Amino acid sequence: MRGNFMSSIEKLGGLKQRLTITVPAEEVDKAYKSRLLKVARTAKIPKFRPGKASPAVVEKLYGKAILQEVGSELIQSSLREAVEEHQLQVAGAPDIKMDKILRGEPFKYVVNFEVYPEITLESLAGETIERTQVEITEEDLDKMLEALRKQYAEWKEVDRPAKADDRVIIDFEGTLDGKPFERGSAKDFQLELGSKRMIAGFEEGIEGMKPGESKALDITFPADYPSEDLAGKAAVFNITLQKVMAPELPVLDEQFAERLGIKEGGLEALRQKVRTNMEKEVHHHMENKLKMAVLDKLIERNPIEVPESLIEAEIDHLQQMTRQQVAMQTHKPDEAKKMELPRDPYREQATKRVKLGLLLAEVVKQHKIKADPEQLRARVEEVAASYQDPEKVISWYYSNKQMLSEIESVVLEDQAVAQLMSELEVKDQAIPYEEAVKQIQQ
């Protein structure tokens, strides 16, 4: 079929449009007869050899089904041609409402859909963003090494009062108005004093207690405590201290370096490795922060309307990601799949992601950006480095077009951001390492 139909376009406001398509009766009959003959050649009908039943017999048995198939085929072909004819950039899945298809009569259907917005990119010239620079001092490095020593500490039981940074084993029971409450008690509970795992006053109240000692603590739950039954309530915790254990830190020497995988170079090699890891962590975070600042400027300079259908599809995608995360955390994939999630909390994020996708695609198109092979290779190698056989993983990526295209999309986005950065002014701002860590943890 080519052009044997009538179509009209109606703009409904915003990005919404409507196509009305009418296929003439003679085209309906022509398509029906063609389909009927095709079915008759292969139909297996009782008392007839395959393909030997007359079209009249086939029509009697399958006429209604054939007519429905013809309707679907006519929609598929005529809609595609109408979209080309009107030069439409359809976004998302169209909503099709069709009249009943009948032989000898015109076949009419209506298509409601959205189109992609027309984008005229505004340059970011004149905009300014801050790029955070982080200097890691020897003091920062020493603190990190001390933290590593604490991670590898051996805990030794001691016979003295408990103090901050000790690990204690306790029994406790919490009561409200003299009555125990749910999840308010435990036996042989392990706790590091100063970890702030418990509500304010709990860990502090254990400090100074001796092994075998019991004590009652009067503690009020915070007003914003997650459990409404406990928020703002005054409770009594009866605590018995079973054990006090103090950390015995390993010596910072070559043997400790070997425990952390340093086979050559000893303590100096360990310091260099730790510094490199610290630099990588802050660099990755600050680069991402810079990228988001650039993208925020892109959205500010280029306000666009986005198709609602794409937002809804992106909400579906975000919810699917949430379910996958829950499945990994709980190890209950079947329950995670059935989770019913509200859509509104995802709408703002989904809208922003769709806007960025459309705007970045336009940046790539306007500046004729193509994925740089060297950057692509570097990205693939970065992913492969976390596997046991990196070379095998690299070969697999380059033999799998779909997986490689996903990394290619990331590279294109990075190149688009680099293009945008070249248009604006970047001011460097130095911050201490500790401040950078706080930002990462937020």
Swiss-Prot record:
GO terms for cellular component: cytoplasm. Its EC number is 5.2.1.8. InterPro entries: PPIase_dom_sf, PPIase_FKBP_dom, Trig_fac, Trigger_fac_C, Trigger_fac_C_sf, Trigger_fac_ribosome-bd_bac, Trigger_fac_ribosome-bd_sf, Trigger_fact/SurA_dom_sf. It is an enzyme of class 5 (isomerase). It comes from the Bacteria. Signal peptide: none annotated. PANTHER family: TRIGGER FACTOR CHAPERONE AND PEPTIDYL-PROLYL CIS/TRANS ISOMERASE, TRIGGER FACTOR-LIKE PROTEIN TIG, CHLOROPLASTIC. NCBIfam families: tig. This is Trigger factor.
